[in-house]
A protein has these predicted regions:
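Intrinsically disordered terminal and processing segments
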Residues: 2-95, 101-185
Length: 185
């Protein structure tokens, strides 16, 4: 009985709700790689040293030590690349798609998944202009500051989730800057 009570208490503390799709991945790809008519997925399997370097830079290690970049082309011309990044929060995971121009700047950001609990916060943050604050960022440049950018126009929980999106964008910038050129065709 004591074990059952402890399990219930832990479950109450870890009140993670189901994940919902806010934007389907194919729709995010089309939005972030406009005009592309061909796509390729490229995996980068990180060595222990590379994984440690990424973890030190942005406190993150990709699942199974593998980064996946999606490139888009229109004919023979590169349209850009994107990466889907998962951010684990106390309220459950969110997934952020970060698209890059061929010049390496952030083209756009789309929050593709969140938990049922966080969905209204994400929608409020996006409505307050969150994703506009990431355009033009480059690896090694300014840190993502979307949360600070919407602080005066959104509630505390929307600003909180914006900070989590900032983490996802920072992780994508670090991964793209350090590893994308090694796999570009």
């Amino acid at each position: 009985m004591n074990l059952l009570i402890r399990a219930a208490a832990i479950a109450a503390l870890l009140h993670i709700t189901p994940v919902v799709v806010l934007v389907k991945r194919p729709d995010a790809v089309q939005a972030l790689l406009p005009g592309a008519d061909a796509y390729v997925a490229r995996e980068v399997h990180l060595s222990g040293t590379d994984a440690h370097r990424l973890h030190e830079a942005v406190d993150w290690s990709p699942e199974d030590g593998v980064l996946v970049f999606y490139g888009g082309t229109a004919g023979s011309t590169s349209v850009g690349a994107l990466e889907f990044v998962r951010v684990d929060t106390p309220h459950g995971p969110i997934e952020v798609a970060v698209g890059f121009t061929p010049q390496g700047a952030v083209r756009g950001v789309v929050v593709t998944k969140a938990t049922v609990e966080m969905k209204p916060w994400v929608l409020e943050a996006v409505a307050a202009g969150l994703t506009d604050h990431y355009r033009g960022l480059k690896p090694g440049g300014e840190a993502p500051a979307g949360a600070a950018g919407i602080a005066s126009r959104a509630g505390n929980l929307a600003v909180y989730v914006a900070g989590e999106v900032d983490k996802g964008v920072a992780r994508a910038l670090a991964a793209y800057g350090a590893f994308y050129n090694h796999v570009r065709a």
